[in-house]
């Protein structure tokens, strides 16, 4: 049995993770820690799953790594600087793995993969991500990652800038720009997590869309990460490799 602790256990995602861990046949929930809780309750875990906040996650990971505990992270707010901090910390603990994923939904991961494959064929590309209004970051980590993948594929294909003749606009009307790709964020009551990637060429468009209607859709990926991180020392970003998509 894999002994699992959950940080952020009382949040929406943390609650769902606790339930998924308890229901899986090969995992055991040994600690459910929330804000203000005692992290030492997780000292006996094989893996800590972190769904906390961008302000708390790095301190949580430093604690876990220093205690030689593997981690699976769904908390947002990661950038190159934070990834490098983790690499430096993990270098002193060569047998410990840390998996950080912008999205644990298998469908969302496939959506990003398909978008990366399609990007080199289309002159235009934009992203619309839609989430519940309690989400604290915009654009979402999934949208940022998708934009980065699209930009890399476009560069490899020799495509230039996305065509856009806009000269006059209201502030924010064209969304944020992530590595040359426009990203639009919607926050609406009733939504959970949704994203569509729009591609365009002469005479046609292609839309790749994924919808998560319930947080249970993320649990298969979380459990895949819990099982997989034990065999992946160092830093792993995304679950694509665990799904055979790399």
From Swiss-Prot:
Coiled coil: none annotated. GO terms for molecular function: 4-hydroxy-tetrahydrodipicolinate reductase; NAD binding; NADP binding; oxidoreductase activity, acting on CH or CH2 groups, NAD or NADP as acceptor. It catalyses: (S)-2,3,4,5-tetrahydrodipicolinate + NAD(+) + H2O = (2S,4S)-4-hydroxy-2,3,4,5-tetrahydrodipicolinate + NADH + H(+); (S)-2,3,4,5-tetrahydrodipicolinate + NADP(+) + H2O = (2S,4S)-4-hydroxy-2,3,4,5-tetrahydrodipicolinate + NADPH + H(+). It is found in: Cytoplasm. The active site is at residues 131, 135. Keywords: Amino-acid biosynthesis, Cytoplasm, Diaminopimelate biosynthesis, Lysine biosynthesis, NAD, NADP, Oxidoreductase. InterPro entries: DapB_C, DapB_N, DapB_N_CS, DHDPR_bac, NAD(P)-bd_dom_sf. (S)-2,3,4,5-tetrahydrodipicolinate binds at residues 132, 141-142. Its EC number is 1.17.1.8. Pfam families: DapB_C, DapB_N. GO terms for biological process: diaminopimelate biosynthetic process; lysine biosynthetic process via diaminopimelate. PANTHER family: 4-HYDROXY-TETRAHYDRODIPICOLINATE REDUCTASE 1, CHLOROPLASTIC-RELATED (PTHR20836:SF0), DIHYDRODIPICOLINATE REDUCTASE (PTHR20836). Catalyzes the conversion of 4-hydroxy-tetrahydrodipicolinate (HTPA) to tetrahydrodipicolinate. This is 4-hydroxy-tetrahydrodipicolinate reductase. It comes from Cutibacterium acnes (strain DSM 16379 / KPA171202) (Propionibacterium acnes). The lineage of its organism: Bacteria, Bacillati, Actinomycetota, Actinomycetes, Propionibacteriales.
């Amino acid at each position: 049995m894999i002994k699992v602790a959950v940080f952020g256990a009382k949040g929406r995602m943390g609650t769902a993770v606790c339930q998924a861990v308890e229901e899986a046949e090969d995992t055991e929930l040994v600690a459910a820690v929330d804000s203000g809780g005692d992290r030492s309750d997780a000292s006996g875990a094989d893996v800590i799953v972190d769904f906390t906040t961008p302000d708390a996650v790095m301190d949580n990971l430093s604690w876990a790594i220093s205690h030689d505990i593997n981690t699976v992270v769904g908390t947002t707010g990661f950038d190159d600087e934070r990834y490098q901090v983790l690499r430096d910390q993990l270098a002193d603990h060569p047998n410990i793995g840390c998996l950080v994923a912008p999205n644990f939904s298998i469908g969302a991961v496939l959506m990003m993969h398909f978008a990366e494959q399609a990007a080199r064929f289309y002159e235009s590309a934009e992203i619309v991500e839609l989430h519940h209004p309690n989400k604290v970051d915009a654009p979402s980590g999934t949208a940022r990652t998708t934009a980065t993948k699209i930009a890399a594929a476009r560069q490899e294909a020799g495509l230039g800038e996305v065509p856009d003749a806009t000269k006059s606009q209201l502030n924010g009307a064209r969304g944020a720009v992530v590595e040359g790709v426009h990203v639009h964020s919607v926050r609406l009551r009733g939504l959970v997590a949704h994203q569509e990637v729009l591609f365009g060429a002469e005479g046609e468009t292609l839309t790749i869309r994924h919808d998560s209607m319930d947080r249970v859709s993320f649990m298969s990926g979380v459990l895949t990460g819990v099982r997989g991180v034990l065999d992946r020392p160092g830093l792993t970003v995304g679950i694509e490799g665990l799904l055979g998509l790399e």
